């Protein structure tokens, strides 16, 4: 008998297992994509999820079965538990035991719910409360394809910079002035435009009198008081300034 290398042996074993499953009448399970031994770029899947209809729809990132406590791990500190509402109605205690077992092992814990029943309102309300109490992020998916997209997206954006979703600071003069003025309680963008239209610049507005400010459209006494308090009060109270101790210049 000729020698068989590891790869050939693995292929023979897989073929034999598939043949046994066909004869036994087992449903065909999705095959994990082949990945390198380094799993940093793949979604980790708990073997209990074999047969989950969402798995065939995870096509844009690799995934593989491995021994983990959650159902899916999409990155360092990011995991997900999966729950079908149809299964939840039959086994309502299941998800609570899974949450208890997982504990707080991950920074971001997601409860991915597949809404596959018509009467779902009461169950969703119950699971929302459970998610809040246990500090989970709850996501509702209305199909297996949608659920798979959520897993793929979390994995794809795992190492993305937060700058992608951060508000870009405005650099033009008007936006910067409006940002400053609207930071004062009670003053909105319309108020800031009225102020700039009247005085032409922030510099002139800062030295305007109370009477001039009260003539602005939409500026009543309360708004004027808040504006003047904000621009006239000192940055630091004199009572909080500590004077340095006197230095003894005498020779000892």
From Swiss-Prot:
Keywords: DNA damage, DNA repair, DNA-binding, Endonuclease, Hydrolase, Nuclease, Nucleus. GO terms for biological process: double-strand break repair via single-strand annealing; gene conversion at mating-type locus; mating type switching; mitotic recombination; UV-damage excision repair. It is found in: Nucleus. One of its GO terms (cellular component) is nucleus. Residues 76-98 bind DNA. Coiled coil: none annotated. Its main location: nucleus. It holds the Pfam family Rad10. One of its GO terms (molecular function) is single-stranded DNA binding. InterPro entries: ERCC1-like_central_dom, ERCC1/RAD10/SWI10, Restrct_endonuc-II-like, RuvA_2-like. Belongs to the ERCC1/RAD10/SWI10 family. Involved in termination of copy-synthesis during mating-type switching. Involved in nucleotide excision repair of DNA damaged with UV light, bulky adducts, or cross-linking agents. Along with RAD16 forms an endonuclease that specifically degrades single-stranded DNA. PANTHER family: DNA EXCISION REPAIR PROTEIN ERCC-1, EXCISION REPAIR CROSS-COMPLEMENTING 1 ERCC1. Heterodimer composed of rad16 and swi10. This is Mating-type switching protein swi10. It comes from Schizosaccharomyces pombe (strain 972 / ATCC 24843).
């Amino acid at each position: 008998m000729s020698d068989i290398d590891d790869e050939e042996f693995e292929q023979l074993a897989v073929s034999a297992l598939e043949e046994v499953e066909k004869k036994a009448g087992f449903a065909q399970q999705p095959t994990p994509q082949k990945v390198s031994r380094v799993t940093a770029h793949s979604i980790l899947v708990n073997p209990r999820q074999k047969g989950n209809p969402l798995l065939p729809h995870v096509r844009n990132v690799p995934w593989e079965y491995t021994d983990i406590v959650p159902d899916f791990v999409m990155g360092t500190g990011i995991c997900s538990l999966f729950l079908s509402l149809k299964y939840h109605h039959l086994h309502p205690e299941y998800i609570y035991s899974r949450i208890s077992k997982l504990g707080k092992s991950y920074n971001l814990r997601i409860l991915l719910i597949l809404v596959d029943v018509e009467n779902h309102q009461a169950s969703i309300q119950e699971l929302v409360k459970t998610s809040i109490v246990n500090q989970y992020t709850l996501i509702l998916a209305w199909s297996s394809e949608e659920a798979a997209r959520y897993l793929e997206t979390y994995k794809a954006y795992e190492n993305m910079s937060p700058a992608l979703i951060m508000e870009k600071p405005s650099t033009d003069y008007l936006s910067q002035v409006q940002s400053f003025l609207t930071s004062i309680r009670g003053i909105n963008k319309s108020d800031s435009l009225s102020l700039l239209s009247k005085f032409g610049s922030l510099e002139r507005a800062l030295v305007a009198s109370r009477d001039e400010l009260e003539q602005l459209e939409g500026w009543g006494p309360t708004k004027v008081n808040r504006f003047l308090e904000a621009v006239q009060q000192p940055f630091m109270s004199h009572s909080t300034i500590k004077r340095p101790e006197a230095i003894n210049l005498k020779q000892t």
